[in-house]
Amino acid sequence: MSGASSGTAIGAHLFGVSPEYRVLIGDEGAGPSKSLSEVSFSVWYRSRAARLVILCLVASFLVPCLTFLIAEAVMGQTVTTPLSLTLDHWSEVRARAHNQGVEVRKKKWITLCKAEWVMMNVGWPREGTFSLDNISQVKKKIFAPGPHGHPDQVPYITTWRSLATDPPSWVRPFLPPPKPPTPLPQPLSPQPSAPLTSSLYPVVPKPDPPKPPVLPPDPSSPLIDLLTEEPPPYPGGHGPPPSGPRTPAASPIVSRLRERRENPAEESQALPLREGPNNRPQYWPFSASDLYNWKSHNPPFSQDPVALTNLIESILVTHQPTWDDCQQLLQALLTGEERQRVLLEARKQVPGEDGRPTQLPNVIDETFPLT
């Protein structure tokens, strides 16, 4: 027994095995048994390989934990922009638009904020903003009259402006600080006027006071003082008496309508008329705000065709639109199917030479083209 123990001790010594390891494997000859903690500390202090193994195990546990904690911290510090804020509260944004009678879609909301409004070159940032100055600049571009306007973007910019002017609780922290009021310029104290002594320009002398009359005042005398009195007024020339009572001049719009009735054969062009400077009628195309107001304050043609028909008739009378204006008006107020039905019905009513609806295609296409 002692020989086996001595052989084990010699083998352990040759292969660098510590006595503690011999105790763990049951070598009774190595001395009295020790506790597991004592053996562990002994292995830690005496075996370099054991220390490396333990350090690797600890590192393999700590590295994933630290990575997870760092990722959580980075995600918690994500920068919030006005655009991302509206997307996080999209249900409230849609409810705000619905209360204004319009509909907005998330995909177009993102496209307008990141691309369309940025390319207007009015200072709109890609991440969006609640600044009323930037919103007003974009709104001015959208509501521009004629082909430069963007009626399809009106619901989106009005919803943006509503969030900025009447902000909910989640928008208030992101509102820009109000601008300080501009101080009014202080009035300058008037400087006493100095006498003109310039040698470049002659000084205008003050007018002399009127001279007293040379002759004594005599009311009964027919003579006048030619030096002080003004000559008597000469009687004005009497023109021929008016031949009849004068009628007030007609307004420009009435004159235009009268000329069109008196000269029906002359070629005329109907233009949307509005009063411009000096109360003169001028051509004004439909603005985006006009089309938006007409569409939002009137029912669709499918629901109430009579109301929309009356609206279009009143617009034709008051604005006298061109053919292109009529196409723009129908495109804004009607759907594609409704617009096609209206055009087909109108082509059936094209009058011929006898005043009745004609069936000749060339006359119909010339009078009422589809495009």
From Swiss-Prot:
Give the span(s) annotated as Disordered.
171-281, 350-371
Annotated Pro residues bias: 174-193, 204-220, 230-245
Output compositional bias ranges, type Low complexity: 194-203
How does the entry describe its membrane topology?
Answer: Single-pass membrane protein
Q: Which GO biological process entries does UniProt record here?
A: virion assembly
Sites of glycosylation? Answer: 134
The organism's superkingdom is given as Viruses
| InterPro entries assigned | G_retro_matrix (IPR000840), G_retro_matrix_sf (IPR036946), Gag_p12 (IPR002079), Gag_P30 (IPR003036), Retrov_capsid_N (IPR008919), Retroviral_Gag-Pol_poly (IPR050462), Retrovr_matrix (IPR010999)
Q: How is it modified after translation?
A: Glycosylated by host. Cleaved by host near the middle of the molecule, releasing the c-terminal half containing capsid and nucleoprotein domains op GAG.
Protein name from the UniProt record? Glyco-Gag protein
Source species of the chain:
Feline sarcoma virus (strain Snyder-Theilen)
